[in-house]
């Protein structure tokens, strides 16, 4: 089978390419340039070239910087500007890795696209990975349903530690097993605020109010805060921790309160992405990547919006983040919290 493998220079994509080559497939590698970090790309391309030469495969360098900027980077900036919390990895997977890269794979005559994601595909649906601690099904849940039939995730049945051990047994790949893992958001080197600083003044002090509307302090600028944050702002006379409940970007104000005020029993979704045909779901939801699953009921509207009723309350729901719905280990749908 002719397969395009997304290669980043990391251990996961390297082992993915190696395993598929050993299984007898015709492999082509592809490195994606997504953002403007010349030294970053140069180092990674050298690693990809090293692996490609070792495996005896061709590789391509695909410049997707403009697409990445329009589909991922600027939406990231604008979502924070709107006082919401973005999920750039979900957008990148849909539009770039499983979008533009898949288009490129097809243009080369490849039957499948393989990546180093920790997840599984079964009967046209995304499943959680065997390694719960590395499961990436949450970030893949915004993928176009039509893309799933072309995807292969060879590491879905492996534990991360075993991937590293496997690489360490092959002389040429030993260095990949010990290299530092990439950060969660590839274009954020330190903090997201430093990224925002390139586009706007984030240090405009504003008012902190309690949930009754009373002014209780000052803050450093609303873009420094996300829902649930409990530090970096003033609350006069407070004797217990206060958390960000709401952000008002137009007024440059944040509303704070006690932890109990973060409790949510229902919420609305937009841009729902269904992998099964349904108008209602009785399932479990994750409201952020590392959150536990919560039982819920979902009522889906014709305009791709939905109402989610939780059977147990959750804390700190952030607009702009993605909610992902599961039936045990199967991904049923996703949507963005509104």
From Swiss-Prot:
Keywords: ATP-binding, Cytoplasm, Disulfide bond, Nucleotide-binding, RNA-binding, Transferase, tRNA processing, tRNA-binding. This is tRNA-specific 2-thiouridylase MnmA. The record marks 117, 321 as: Interaction with tRNA. GO terms for cellular component: cytoplasm. Residues 134-136, 288-289 are annotated as: Interaction with tRNA. The active site is at residues 92, 186. GO terms for molecular function: ATP binding; tRNA binding; tRNA-uridine 2-sulfurtransferase activity. Belongs to the MnmA/TRMU family. ATP binds at residues 6-13, 32, 116. Its EC number is 2.8.1.13. It is an enzyme of class 2 (transferase). Its main location: cytoplasm. GO terms for biological process: tRNA wobble position uridine thiolation. The keyword Cytoplasm applies. Disulfide bonds join 92-186. It is found in: Cytoplasm. Catalyzes the 2-thiolation of uridine at the wobble position (U34) of tRNA, leading to the formation of s(2)U34. It catalyses: S-sulfanyl-L-cysteinyl-[protein] + uridine(34) in tRNA + AH2 + ATP = 2-thiouridine(34) in tRNA + L-cysteinyl-[protein] + A + AMP + diphosphate + H(+). Pfam families: tRNA_Me_trans, tRNA_Me_trans_C, tRNA_Me_trans_M. The keyword Disulfide bond applies. It comes from Campylobacter lari (strain RM2100 / D67 / ATCC BAA-1060).
């Amino acid at each position: 089978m002719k397969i395009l493998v997304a290669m980043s220079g990391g251990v996961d994509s390297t082992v993915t390419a190696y395993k598929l080559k050993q299984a007898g497939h015709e492999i082509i590698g592809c490195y994606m340039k997504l953002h403007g970090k010349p030294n970053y790309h140069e180092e990674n391309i050298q690693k990809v070239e090293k692996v490609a030469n070792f495996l005896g495969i061709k590789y391509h360098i695909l410049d997707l910087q403009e697409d990445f900027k329009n589909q991922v980077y600027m939406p990231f900036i604008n979502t924070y500007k709107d006082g919401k919390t973005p999920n750039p990895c979900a957008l990148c997977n849909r539009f770039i890795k499983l979008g533009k890269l898949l288009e490129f794979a097809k243009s080369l005559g490849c039957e499948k696209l393989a990546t180093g994601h920790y997840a599984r595909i079964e009967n046209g649906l995304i499943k959680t990975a065997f390694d719960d601690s590395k499961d990436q099904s949450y970030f893949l849940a915004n993928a176009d349903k039509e893309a799933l039939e072309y995807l292969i995730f060879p590491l879905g049945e492996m534990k991360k530690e075993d991937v590293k051990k496997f690489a360490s047994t092959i002389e040429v790949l030993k260095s990949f097993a010990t290299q530092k893992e990439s950060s969660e958001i590839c274009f954020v080197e330190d903090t997201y605020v430093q990224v925002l600083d390139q586009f706007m003044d984030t240090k405009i002090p504003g008012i902190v109010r309690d949930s009754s509307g009373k002014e209780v302090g000052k803050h450093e600028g609303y873009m420094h805060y996300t829902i649930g944050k409990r530090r970096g702002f003033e609350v006069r006379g407070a004797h217990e921790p206060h958390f960000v409940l709401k952000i008002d970007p137009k007024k440059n104000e944040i509303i704070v309160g006690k932890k109990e005020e973060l409790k949510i029993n229902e919420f609305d979704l937009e841009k729902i992405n269904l992998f099964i045909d349904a108008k209602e779901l009785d399932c479990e939801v994750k409201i952020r990547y590392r959150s536990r699953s919560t039982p819920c009921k979902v009522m889906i509207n014709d305009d791709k919006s939905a109402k989610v009723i939780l059977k147990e309350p959750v804390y700190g729901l952030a607009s702009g983040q993605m909610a992902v719905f599961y039936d045990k280990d199967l991904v049923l749908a996703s949507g963005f919290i509104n």
